[in-house]
Amino acid sequence: MPFEQTQLFCDEKPTILKKLDTRNEIADTIRSVSTSKISETSFQYVLKDVNICLPKINIPNEILMKHEVEKYRLLFQSKPQTARKSISVKTVSCAEECVLLCKSERAEDETVNMSAKILNFSCSKCQDSTQYSPNDLQKHFEMWHHGELPSFPCEMCSFSASDFQIFKQHRKTHRNTFVKCDICNSERSYTLLDLTKHFTSKHCVNGNFQCEECRFFTQDVGTFVQHIHRHKEVHYKCGKCHHLCFTKGELQKHLRVHSGTLPFTCHYCSYGAIHKDQLIRHVITLHKEHLYAKEKLERDQYDKRVAKTTTTGLKLILKRYKIGPTKTFWKRKTITSGNDESIGKNAQAFNIVSKTQTKSEDQSQEQVNGEKGEKQHCENGDKPVESESEKATVLSTGQYNKADEGASTTSSSVLSAVQGPTVLLVRNNKITIPANYSAKFMGFKMVDGRQHIVIKLLPANKQILPSPVLQSNTEKNSTANLSPQAVANTGFATGLTTKVNDTDFVKAAPPACSSPVLARKVISEKEAAFISEKNNTLQMVDDSKSLSSLPTTSTTSVRVTTKVEARDNVDLWENDSPQSHPDASDTSISSPDKVSLTPKPNAYSSGDMHNYCINYVNSELPAESSNSFEFSNQGSLPFHNYSKVNNKRRRFSRATLCENLQKESPNKTVTQQSTSDSDTASPLLRKESSNSDNLFASINPLNGTLKIKTEIEEPYNLEETQNFNEQSLFTNENQNLLNVTEEPKWNDIPSAGSPMMPRITSVFSLQSEQASEFLTPEVNQLLQDTLKPKSDIKEDSNNIPSKNLPFDCDQTLKKSEEVVIKSSKDFQMQDDIPVPSASVGVNVPANDLNSKCNGQEKQGLSVLQDVRDSEVTTKIPNIITLLKTQSDAIITQQLVKDKLRTTTQNSGPVYVQNPFLTSEQKNPVFVQTPKGFIIPLHVANKPGLHVFSGRPVPLVNTRSVPATLLVNKKPGMLLATNNGKPESVPTVKTENVHSYGTVTKEPCKTPFLKAEHNNSCLTPGLCSSIGNCVNMKTCSENTLPLKGSYIIKTSVNSSVKAVPNILPEQQGPKMNILDTVKQQNENLPKASLYTLMPDGKQAVFFKCVMPNNTKLLKPKLVQSSTYQHIQPKRPAGAPQKILVKIFNPVLSMSAFNNLSASNSASSFQKEIVPSKPTVHGEQKEPETSRNALPVLVHGLMPANETVHSSTTACPGSSEEPVYISERSETRVLRGKANCAVERNFNKRKTCKNKFAKIKTRIDQDSETAFVSRNRSCKRKYIDNYQEPPRKKSTLNRKGKERASAEDVQEAFGFSRPRLPKDSSRTLRLFPFSSKQLVKCPRRNQPVVVLNHPDADTPEVERVMKTIAKFNGHVLKVSLSQTTINALLKPVSNTSETTYNDFSKRQKMLKPVNSVKERFVLKLTLKKTSKNNYQIVKTTSEDVLKSQFNCWFCGRVFDNQDVWAGHGQRHLVEATRDWNMLE
């Protein structure tokens, strides 16, 4: 009996396919179903006398089941497919998803053999019609015929082979077989290859091959050839008509037409059809709604099955709106509480939950721009439990995409709070919330282009146990807005931000319960460790060593947590006190003596994993209330601030967090106990600004970047002042020991977005709001990632503040931004509370903070405290020391111990910052001043005044910290004076120190000169520009300090003593510098640099003069990397001898206030004393080393100047004197040192060739003044060579030049010297206007490479730098008018301007006689090979360009010939194997 195969079609009603219902017309119009290979044992049906219906349109049944109705329409519109891809095995689907694979058995059904390239064979042993591929036939014989060799017969002859490879070789012999065309019936013979070509050319109609004897058609010529040959075989002819069939199945299928039966009937009506495709067409046309209903039914059934398989619990439905780089919108959904889960002791902490308290759930839901909170206090006998707290949890979208309900057995990650049962468990991408808490979805947060989920936990039962006194004080004085600070967990992404509402939270416990509390804290801290993204290892924090044991005299234990944030259109304060104002946001903290709580040891759990620094800023409190300073005793993990800032309101907000402030009643000492935190990086002060003046920085443990978002300038309001009366800061050395268990390895992490790195984002305005709106977070992050240079900076060590650092200053902030700080020497030592060495504390007598600060800005002192390890000696040398580099072995040991911390910054005029500890535990202290001023400061244990200048002074870079430690990249200057005379100026070594540029448009105005006390020399540590600095990557073996001397001179009788600074390990000739410097130009007015204060004490005034047109200031030097490999090695500790000489006229208090730019400039220009260092040896110094440091002083240093440490000097090379002239034109006068000649400082007069000749030429078109120097004479100098008249005339001539150039002071800039041709050239691209956004170009645009030999101007250099930065992204560059003018006109004329020694080894600049060479630069260049470019022909925009699209791959061509040739290659590929019949 014939076997019947059933299948479902559009419903549960089956359709029967009988065995004889077959036909030969096979045309698959959509796709061919892949044949599933099944084993012989799994075949459950006897396939004897079975034929499967192969309709004309072969539609797999799963299409109907998958509801792809629209594809049915394409079935009848698309071209039929070749028969060679048809199959004999049908896939039958049913509603129960069972698939039955059937194979055709009939030998006459040779549909598979239609293929000219796919060969199938039948088994010669089984004698059935089952077709096998060569591999399947081989397996069949091995399985069923005991490993006998199969037989592969040739269909063209009687040849048979047992090996398929031999069979293939035999088939190649038939290629030369001559056959005739059966359609033409001519006598001409063709080979098989020629026959296919003949069919293609003669018998192909619109790409189809139609058989004249039957209805068969195909698009494949090989299949058509085989089909033609089949007609020669035995045929089955219909008796009622003349239809010929090749198989019995086809004949039986054809006989249905004459029988009048309709085997295919419709399930929805009485329609019947002979062929299946007719029925399909009928259903799609008339019964479409039934298909949709069936689709919906199956989808509902699928959803039910999915719901049964998933567990009940937490499930979120999140609606996302458009999310930009700077703004995030969301809808909030209430999250149901899940099951309660307890955390194990070894549970891995996956994220940080920041504690907040809000007054009500609705209030926190309404606070979109600014969240306001009210403090809640709870007391519990044994264990401090958070009665009402909101936990904000940041979850990565990738971690949460599959957030299902329920808990799993394996714990992959844990979101844990600090204390109590408030713990979110994340197991197998499922979030479980404790039963006593309810969760609220706060929305999405975009951080670094990655999306995260913010969840807030609310306690189910709210129990408020307030302390009346404490609550009243904190409500009035300690209310703060939320600062969006969250720990950037390494498990998610860089800088995860958790928007929470932090308010004061005070816990107290009886003394009897102190031990249990400590034990529980240690356990919770171990549970709350970090998961490092790099190694995914659990870093446990052991706090047993960091818990501070306090003396019994402490009566209260208060921990205050305050955060402040400025937000859009939201008042910064919700405070009852009238002192709050929108222009300055500070945290109001009540006096500690007003708080009375039960004393308990202040052991703060580091399980918080957000040990923020203490930034305890006083607000406008009464005078009797104790004021506190900012402390930074603990680091914090990095986070980004993505809060929205109103630019019209206050431009920054201070985020302060005071932890563990313990007040002692006898002497009112506030003690902070810090704990060990393995991954604490640095406290962060949020300063928000929407313009491009802010410096983006964030501490990122993932990629090792230290980004601190600070503000360049803060508006000063003179109406309101803040007085800090009698405030002094003391640090006890016994409390400066921090036990560090582990530190992340920063060496392996790339420094991304470091503030000191040259950031192109300032050029492309990627940091601004308008640019962020156009660029997606992924693109923005990609662009910033391309700017991440690897940091080769070596981490020297951490540092601690010096023992008992008193600071007393009287600061007056005036409208002209002049600050006078009077120094005092009446500091006294005060006893501090001893703390064991395993702990860290800062003892600050609250009644002895003796700092008087006037001004609207709240001035504060922030002390950075950090310790290398617990074995640091207690004796600390005096301050003003710089880092001593250590060996690589010591650095390797310290990688696990050292901790990176930086202090939070205010915008006040005075800061105390402590860089990192040296190997001798020497502690430099830097004081920040307003821009443009140098402040003398008297420091304890140090005679004389110490002058500090600049913006917040950058800290010294260390190797373990690829991210630089610049809090605010404003450079400063550090000088030391004693009784009106400069001291032996300490040394700053600049090897391993990068030279970076700021991102902001506001230029820096003073160089930063850091000094080291031992070596008695001074070197420029950092001189920043506006981001156009070249990153110097110098290794410790191949770095040399700057060559040259700065001469500091303050009065007639003052002298500078340069102490010889020769290290024992330094090789080569020794450098001997004489002791004294004699003064010159006695006819010039000489006066002391100091003026007297009203109390008779001296004060030093320095004012910087800066041209307004700072955007035209060009970099003076770019380091040539081509010379680094030829430099001899020099010990890393080799110091630098540079002296600075500053000349000032008599200035009074009133005269200084009215000091003009010309007066200040002329005072520095009068005297220029050349120094003659004595050098022994004949060692030749490379030319570039002498020019490695062009020191440009405008005031002290122009903002846009770049200073690099030279890497080309020999170890024994001479010291080159560098002369600093303070002039508005910021000229550079540099004497040249010859390595083979002795020169001493005793000679008052020098020769004419000692000085550089300055020739200035003002170009009004380009508004740029190019200042160049004449090359020094190559002949050697003799000691007694003097030329006084020429010396005097040179000075007079310079004075005339200064007078003539003062009128165009603001239009002056600097041109960079010629670089070697083999050196890398980089250019930077500026937008035409401030409103213009420079974006990455689109594709299909040619690359512009302005590598012209004459393209040496700074404008072109910027373009090249941009192209170099965005490797492969910059495809089009448009030039501004200034750039075009610079390109069209020659830079200089050889008859007028001379050139520097920098281009000695190169040819001189050729004068451009033709504009055509410059005009080439304006053309668009297209890269043809690695180093070759061709000019792209430009057409007028009015002419319509014709484009040609490739018919195969869609590639666009503008040239028809290229398009035609491209298409021919596709044709060749398509017809390559037509001569093969395999």
Swiss-Prot record:
Residues 576-593 have a biased composition (Polar residues). Residues 1287-1296 have a biased composition (Basic residues). The keyword Nucleus applies. Residues 356-393, 569-603, 658-696, 1282-1305 are annotated as: Disordered. Gene3D superfamilies: Classic Zinc Finger. It is found in: Nucleus. There is a cross-link at residues 359, 391, 430, 521, 709, 794, 884, 897, 989, 1010, 1043, 1057, 1078, 1116, 1180, 1441 (Glycyl lysine isopeptide (Lys-Gly) (interchain with G-Cter in SUMO2)). Residues 671-680 have a biased composition (Low complexity). Keywords: Chromatin regulator, DNA-binding, Isopeptide bond, Metal-binding, Nucleus, Phosphoprotein, Repeat, Transcription, Transcription regulation, Ubl conjugation, Zinc, Zinc-finger. Through its association with the EHMT1-EHMT2/G9A and PRC2/EED-EZH2 histone methyltransferase complexes may function in gene silencing, regulating repressive post-translational methylation of histone tails at promoters of target genes. This is Zinc finger protein 518A. The lineage of its organism: Eukaryota, Metazoa, Chordata, Craniata, Vertebrata.
